[in-house]
Amino acid sequence: MTNLQDQTQQIVPFIRSLLMPTTGPASIPDDTLEKHTLRSETSTYNLTVGDTGSGLIVFFPGFPGSIVGAHYTLQSNGNYKFDQMLLTAQNLPASYNYCRLVSRSLTVRSSTLPGGVYALNGTINAVTFQGSLSELTDVSYNGLMSATANINDKIGNVLVGEGVTVLSLPTSYDLGYVRLGDPIPAIGLDPKMVATCDSSDRPRVYTITAADNYQFSSQYQTGGVTITLFSANIDAITSLSVGGELVFKTSVQSLVLGATICLIGFDGTAVITRAVAANNGLTAGIDNLMPFNLVIPTNEITQPITSIKLEIVTSKSDGQAGEQMSWSASGSLAVTIHGGNYPGALRPVTLVAYERVATGSVVTVAGVSNFELIPNPELAKNLVTEYGRFDPGAMNYTKLILSERDRLGIKTVWPTREYTDFREYFMEVADLNSPLKIAGAFGFKDIIRAIRRIAVPVVSTLFPPAAPVAHAIGEGVDYLRGDEAQAASGTARAASGKARAASGRIRQLTLAADKGYEVVANLFQVPQNPVVDGILASPGILRGAHNLDCVLREGATLFPVVITTVEDAMTPKALNNKMFAVIEGVREDLQPPSQRGSFIRTLSGHRVYGYAPDGVLPLETGRDYTVVPIDDVWDDSIMLSKDPIPPIVGNSGNLAIAYMDVFRPKVPIHVAMTGALNACGEIEKISFRSTKLATAHRLGLKLAGPGAFDVNTGPNWATFIKRFPHNPRDWDRLPYLNLPYLPPNAGRQYHLAMAASEFKETPELESAVRAMEAAANVDPLFQSALSVFMWLEENGIVTDMANFALSDPNAHRMRNFLANALQAGSKSQRAKYGTAGYGVEARGPTLEGAQREKDTRISKKMETMGIYFATQEWVAFNRHRRPSPGQLKYWQNTREIPDPNEYYLDYVHAEKSRLASEEQILRAATSIYGAPVQAEPLQAFIDEVAKVYEINHGRGPNQEQMKDLLLTAMEMKHRNPRRAPPKPKPKPNAPTQRPPGRLGRWIRTVSDEDLE
């Protein structure tokens, strides 16, 4: 697929660089092969936030050159003001002549705070607009979000500290190199003279009808009267030219005109002003011509241009105030933007607006741009350049991935943290051998695997040197270089194998259905949707793939062939196998050059192109057909092959042509056909059956061919027709039955061709096979050995088992494996799958089967208990339950079979109630109501407790009832006037009085009375 030799990791460098530009540049794998050098250029700017805290950054993500974008600040009057252009670090035109942009990513965020600010405020809105800058109608912070409806092209309210990342995705492919406007050698008298070579590829041209008999009338003023004759939106960031003419007519003498062209920037200011006419006198009565021929070089365009206007100044020689001035004008002009229509040059644009950021903060813009560059002659002396690598597989893989980018979650604008988290996912996308674990977590696994299935085969088909045809060189056959192998008739051909297969014991494959397929009467397997590695994909999963040039959406029938060369009359030598399609009409333009010009006539005189001219095709067809090689089939399309395949012959193609002629399907039929007819018109088996089966299986198809077993089609063919809506509704029989040259029992001899060893038709081999068949009929052990061999061959593990046998000569490991493997009926197998015997796939029971087993089990148990009315049918009607107590009592009392789902509650004895004593109720009420020191419970509370005992048939309250009683008691205590008085709260301890001082043992204290 890629140019790497490492088989464990197949990276597509181009898509990796697109999704992760910081990983470096990669050559674009298209067929534009120029010697170039790869270079990564960085862009880093620290932008200061203005007074309003808002601004706008305009990016040109696809521009092939040094220009990256521009920065504008929002003024207090609501208008934007241009700040500066954003460029790459190196001025590319100074060193390089031509350029192609490979990838680009830019990050906008802020992490700095001005003095006095302690919080990082502000948010960012970003949107990618699929148009030019001048086409935006609302560039306000909130209005930007209405520029597109694609959710993957806009994000809003991202914190300025987190930042956003802008990713450049290609808007077109297979593009040429663009001239950079580099300086060219020149000599002039003026030292400031500059000569450059600008891009002339894909210019953008604006045609403006400036005036169509426009009438001007005014009175003379000093300095003249100025009017804007026209103003039109244009887009330019590179050099441009203006050309055209105006014709003026007047009846006033001595009128003088001046004309000025102004190029207006995005902020509304005039970037460039050029006078194209000054003091041009008009002659009355005649046509006065005013031509325009203006060239603006790139170095003068200092900011993006979004409009152009033409101003006319009217005056009069020696005029007096109040004198009348009038004229009429007609004419048009054209504005040519050099390289402006190159994809990515002016559209799309990505706008990143920030709001409410602290004044003086710094918004950092950092990014990388990857280029393919062709150096100028001076630099080329010291810089090695090399050709790009043509890799159509990588290119188509990239196209298919990006065509589904909305469904794969690939955005153009990201929150920076989310983009960083997605890098591992992008690595999975770029690595063809990755297991897609992260993609599976996001739900993208099926889509990417389907794209890989389509894109990978393109390498070997469109670019054979990338993956040569298997065994072609090793076998010494060099038909890829033009030395085609010569068949017996002198013409190289692909033979489908007419010989009878040697083995008559090819049995039908037991596991006939792959995951994602519908099996129809064991006859055909028709995918209703694309199948990729056994995973069913949804219809239309690869809409973008239909845009490839090699994809054909027409009715077709498919058949495989084996490309052979003939060494002698008896020994064909197989080289390769290929799938072919039969399409209606003469379509040699779809064939590879090696097949064109070769055709065979049918019995009715029509032609089949792509067949070797070997006699007459034994068919009567109603029209011409073309046989083309194909590489893949999915949905309702086929992918054509450009391999140098020679013209073909063979019965498989005859069957496919007959099928196409009779039924004319409108879409490719998803079943490959093969078969052979003997001289008597009877169906024979075919050789190369396993090779053809492998060919069909690679495309997710099954091979329908002749076999030794009858297949009863019955009404199932009509079911198949209904499942395939493109077919006519009157197809109620197997199509093979309607082929004009097949025997009546042909349909019953067709089934899915199974894998078999590839035998050569030799007498010795046929006798050996017959001997093996005879031995198998009489020796059961030999029969088992043949069955094991068939099982190994059908599943494609013969070589693996042979290698395993070499490493285990005494079969010790195999015996241990078989001894520990799950056996039919073992406990571990029953626990996981249910019961199953050998040769039968163990599956868990269905819901109906499990219910039937339960009914049988209940019925047998009831029978052992003497309850004979509970039969299996009765249990099923009883909702798969055993008889209830009421049903059993009814049967015991009446000896009549009770009705299912009737419970007979009258026959069930009511529960006996126990009456609680008054003492028990009072004791419980007192315990619940409060402590013994409190007042006795109220009679109302005692009655509540008695009700609980009555409800519980004499038992005490449960937990819920106890909670309710406690709440009731609390309420009654608060409103009870006879409740016990609350205990007085203890007073705080007062400090004791200080005793009087001790005066002596016999001295009495003098009191107040003594003093009186």
UniProtKB/Swiss-Prot annotation:
Biological role: Capsid protein VP2 self assembles to form an icosahedral capsid with a T=13 symmetry, about 70 nm in diameter, and consisting of 260 VP2 trimers. The capsid encapsulates the genomic dsRNA. VP2 is also involved in attachment and entry into the host cell by interacting with host ITGA4/ITGB1. The precursor of VP2 plays an important role in capsid assembly. First, pre-VP2 and VP2 oligomers assemble to form a procapsid. Then, the pre-VP2 intermediates may be processed into VP2 proteins by proteolytic cleavage mediated by VP4 to obtain the mature virion. The final capsid is composed of pentamers and hexamers but VP2 has a natural tendency to assemble into all-pentameric structures. Therefore pre-VP2 may be required to allow formation of the hexameric structures.
Bias-annotated ranges (Basic residues): 975-986
GO BP, one annotated term: proteolysis
Pfam families: Birna_VP2, Birna_VP3, Birna_VP4
PTM section of the record: Specific enzymatic cleavages yield mature proteins. The capsid assembly seems to be regulated by polyprotein processing. The protease VP4 cleaves itself off the polyprotein, thus releasing pre-VP2 and VP3 within the infected cell. During capsid assembly, the C-terminus of pre-VP2 is further processed by VP4, giving rise to VP2, the external capsid protein and three small peptides that all stay closely associated with the capsid.
Protein name, entry field: Structural polyprotein
Region (Interaction with VP1 protein): 1003-1012
GO molecular function: metal ion binding; serine-type peptidase activity; structural molecule activity
Peptidase S50 domain location: 513-755
PROSITE patterns, per database record: BIRNAVIRUS_VP4_PRO
